């Protein structure tokens, strides 16, 4: 029995040890237990870049040796009499190969030297050298993860040196994941992202990323890191003599892609090529990236992960090199940015058509608050942005490799990017015909297989959540073809098709523009054969709409655009209903093989269209938003509208009703107004169709013809509402910044708004703004308001209504750090044109209350009241009888604000052009003219449901069956039309959680069962050994003897 007790004790110890071991296996990255009293550290990453003084990147129109490049530059500069120049040496692995650029330093006569260089026939472009900074900052956060674990979070930076404030990704994660605080502990546990996305299914099929070359552009990697077994090459592109990662970010990214143990990556057998492009001080240069990109092309990389970016999509050397990379069959994956939830905050290069742009979600499939939103802003003001991100995946609380081993958790889209890069690497290794793999085909597979998230629009989720197994199914039977993104246009489908679905179309309205991306998996170059064809469905009233096309003449690299303008025909001016049709386009690409020299591959794609038409609304309900006169960064330095926001120096979100004025647009739609966007001069719209023209935060100048036309329009009934912003040349000089590293000044090209231009526009009505700069809280009509860096009204007609307030003089505070209070500052003016049938004019000195960027208190109620006044002539009693109403200022004795001497606005203006002396207006451009496509009517019924997963040709997901390695693994099944995209799993368990949590319990139960069986056999053996042997019977002892030795009773 003692032996039995001993074995039972051993069993108990083993079971307890197994339970403890299971806990350790479930939380291998947690080196210590959570301690509520400890603070959790969040690592914030910020990016910025500056122009390096005297240094320029000379881009050639081909690849040349160092001797030839030197010869070209020398011969070009001889004629310019520039003597003090030199070529900056670049000692890196690509210096032994021909290059397409050189970095030079010119310290005298820069302008003459640059012009002479650009005139050389072998030189394509000369641009300034840029210095990139990345800073890492630790901040305390909620103590939800263990004390010793550091969660990283990244904040991207604009391409100017004043740093943007980092969003707190920890708090943003909680805002995004739901409302049930009792579930936070579950969400706080970092997940094994590879298993969550079911990469282990492909591993068990024998696919582990072997023979796929992956480039990781980051902070390097230690040589003997225990998580990696196939680091093929490490290269250093910095000025530091080390290849190791001294910060950990590059190690984490590489681990998500290819770690082989602990926090396992997607492709452990992939060939890792580590490009160290950041120093330990987090400094990099554009030239370092260009050299590294050239080397990646030379080494024939298959996949490249780039977890950095910024808003400067006009950084030509960088953008051009990204195009060249993808043209050389490098699949680039890049993070979309961490500037959410604001719209219009996409980062480059992820916003390029040929790059896979990745957004972030949490492990409950909610869009991460920090993830940047679309649309792209390249196309403004004349066009409309594209759908981005392309896909979303896990980017909050993801586990990856620590710098010295172990695991750590990070958050940010720079985390989501390597998740997709690792998935792509694994997918590429599954393709037998590797020649079918290219940036377009992989992107086609990812977006066609993505799972749509319910209740989220396309500018937040792109095509949906990454689905690794469905992407594998598609690539397994892929045939080269063209496809479209988005694959259909349904202006009635909300919320996915927001903002298109938020407003029906009608006759006389501005054409609705949909920007579709063409992906060409047949070749790096292609073209659209003939013209796109418009085929309306007659039974579905397709003849009530007309369409026009604008498209890429050449599809390169791997992609192009198809802009579709949709309008309503005159016969449907009073009609209401749904109209449908489809567009057919044929894409052709040259055959790549020598056997088919001169031949072409073709692919025909159908684009369904569905729109809702209503009768033309009354003029009073139609508001026209002026987009043409809004300027942004890039390319110019247009400063922020709220000077308090020192951490966000640039006005870079597009100032569009679907980007940083989204909430205002939503509010106007909820109030019954129809908002249209003008992307052309004032001479290009019919003012009789609109009740109010809305000018908000305008930075552009005005053509003289525009000023004259607007005066006529207002006299004939058009109303004008202007929300201005600050403008003060002294303050502009003050908010210029001096970069200590480059010793260069950056000067704003205008103020928050262009007050001199607005005053010229308003001068015919004796109105104008001042260059005063004011700030403060106040109450107007029982509403709390905040005036953020606004200007005042300098003059206004005597018979107008003017509202004043008491504010702080922010201009004095900025210039002299002194505080002063100014009473009776005119901020709001209302005026009725006296002529019969005349319109009304409203001026307000601050637009921040409408702008989503840094709004503290909205003034949507005020906009409602002003539109009631401009549309119906009803002056709000709360304003006309306000105690703050004062006599309108006459402007006497006040000098009007002047344009700042030496400004460079003409470089970025659509109105001004450079001229000797002051810039002069350009000739007025012609108004856009649309050529409507000739319809080819179809007498057939349109499909009832346009939303299907983008079926690529010759691919049937039902026929591609995945092996069932585990009997309890949920199987992937194709979506039927109209489904929400959820997995079909009994009990509603998400597949990632099922595999990770339930799957990990199987070995525990197996171990317990083995221990129970072992204990059973041990007990049986012990019983057998302790059983007494049979003995021969003996004669009984005398009774006396028995009484002398009484039996012992067992003690309990």
Swiss-Prot record:
One of its GO terms (molecular function) is metalloendopeptidase activity. It catalyses: Processes precursors containing basic and hydrophobic/aliphatic residues at P4 and P2, respectively, with a relatively relaxed acceptance of amino acids at P1 and P3. Residues 190-472 form the Peptidase S8 domain. Glycans are attached at residues 148, 236, 305, 515, 728, 939. Inhibited by divalent copper and zinc ions, but not by nickel or cobalt. Inhibited by its prosegment, but not smaller fragments. Inhibited by 4-(2-aminoethyl)benzenesulfonyl fluoride (AEBSF), a serine protease inhibitor. It is a single-pass type I membrane protein. GO terms for cellular component: endoplasmic reticulum membrane; Golgi membrane; Golgi stack. It is an enzyme of class 3 (hydrolase). Residues 1-17 form the signal peptide. Residues 877-887 have a biased composition (Polar residues). The 148 kDa zymogen is processed progressively into two membrane-bound 120 and 106 kDa forms in the endoplasmic reticulum, and late into a secreted 98 kDa form. The propeptide is autocatalytically removed through an intramolecular cleavage after Leu-186. Further cleavage generates 14, 10, and 8 kDa intermediates. Its main location: endoplasmic reticulum. Residues 18-186 form a propeptide. Keywords: Autocatalytic cleavage, Calcium, Cholesterol metabolism, Endoplasmic reticulum, Glycoprotein, Golgi apparatus, Hydrolase, Lipid metabolism, Membrane, Phosphoprotein, Protease, Serine protease, Signal, Steroid metabolism, Sterol metabolism, Transmembrane, Transmembrane helix, Zymogen. Residues 1023-1052 are cytoplasmic. Residues 187-999 are lumenal. Interacts with LYSET; this interaction bridges GNPTAB to MBTPS1. Belongs to the peptidase S8 family. This is Membrane-bound transcription factor site-1 protease. It comes from Mus musculus.
